[in-house]
Amino acid sequence: MTFWNLSDRDSWLGANNYPLPFDREYKPKNVYRVIKNFNPALDNAEIKEDFVPSVMNQPGQQYPMVNSQGYARFRVEAPQARSVIVSLGLGGQGGTVLHKNEEGVWVGTTDGPLDEGFHYYHLTIDGGVVNDPGAKNYYGSVRWESGIEIPAHDQDFYQVKDVPHGQVVQVLFPSPSTNSTKRAFVYLPPQYDGKKKFPVLYLQHGWGEDETAWHRQGHANLIMDNMIAAGECKPFIIVMTYGMTNEVKFGGLASFNFKNFETVLVDELVPYIDANFKTIAKKDSRAMAGLSMGGMETRNITLARPEVFGYYGLLSGGTYSPEDIKDPAQVKGIFISCGSKEGPDRIMQAAEALKAAGFNAKGYVSPGTGHEFLTWRRSLREMAPMLFQK
């Protein structure tokens, strides 16, 4: 295989800003690997023209669209633009180059099918990053991003059904440690009537997201409604708050200080929730879990404050070892998970080591997914039944 003219700038980016095989440091891009592994038989596979609007589109908008194979198709009206690229994923990875038609409208389809579930994306138009006006916005990558949903074969568990529904309520709570007022969202199960007391799961978002992530991108409330209606888990309250107490820009996770959030969560939010909602204010009736960075927060806080939470959950957020906790009686249950594309062996090995040491532990691997919300939706479904069991 030979590539010509790779020593000049246009060969890195292309004359029209189209991405070519190598970056400015001569490192191969994903497109190089695609070309290297090109299979003519696969290339002849037809894309089914059964595209329908994404369920996350703005009302009345036809694009973006998705088909039954998992391809996404985009349409952007920008007649004066010179280039339009769609970047998918947290932080905007890669790019689907759109092409302008005779009407001055930019259209294009992803090179291959996307993983099932939710994906962030944005547009880069002539070098400027903007959202797609056809799609609803979701907070991720430390900014509002567009969202698209690829229908999953097992999506029934997070669909709206004709079952009793709980409420997601917004609360504002004082935070003396940050000299501010913080926001949290609280899921109250259908059985919550202000009389009976319920256990509580404190559920954290990932890096670059906020307290809206779990009930908007993650559909945590719908998952719980459906599981409670089916008798698959006990009813419990879920509290979701903003975990990025340090105002750190995208890419600054290494400098993030977890101690500040520990104070906000344990010393300020937990007492507020216990004082204002009907909760069972005991360690064994509290759980903490989180995805990605939220899992890292969970691990740090549960180890630092073992007297507060009885159940721990790390969703694509690392592992525990028996040496971390030492006494199996200290914790009622541990759940760890990741997607099958995230190096799942370490998750299952860690779960087995915990079980061998006498811990009530469960490991779960989401099939066919990576560091993305379908992994975490499934993880919540798998974790919920083990919480708050006598």
Where are these regions (language model features)?
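Short glycine/proline-rich, acidic loop/turn segments that cap or connect secondary-structure elements
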Residues: T2-G14, A350-N360
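Low-complexity, Pro/Thr/Ser/Gly/Ala-rich linker/spacer regions in secreted
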Residues: N37-E49, K326
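N-terminal edge beta-strand
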Residues: I47-G70
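Aromatic-rich peripheral "rim/lid" segments of glycoside hydrolase catalytic domains that contact
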Residues: W4-L42, L387-K390
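Non-catalytic cap/lid and distal C-terminal segments of serine-dependent acyl enzymes
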Residues: G60, N67-G95, K100-K390
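Short, well-ordered coil↔helix boundary/capping segments
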Residues: M1, K29, K341-D345
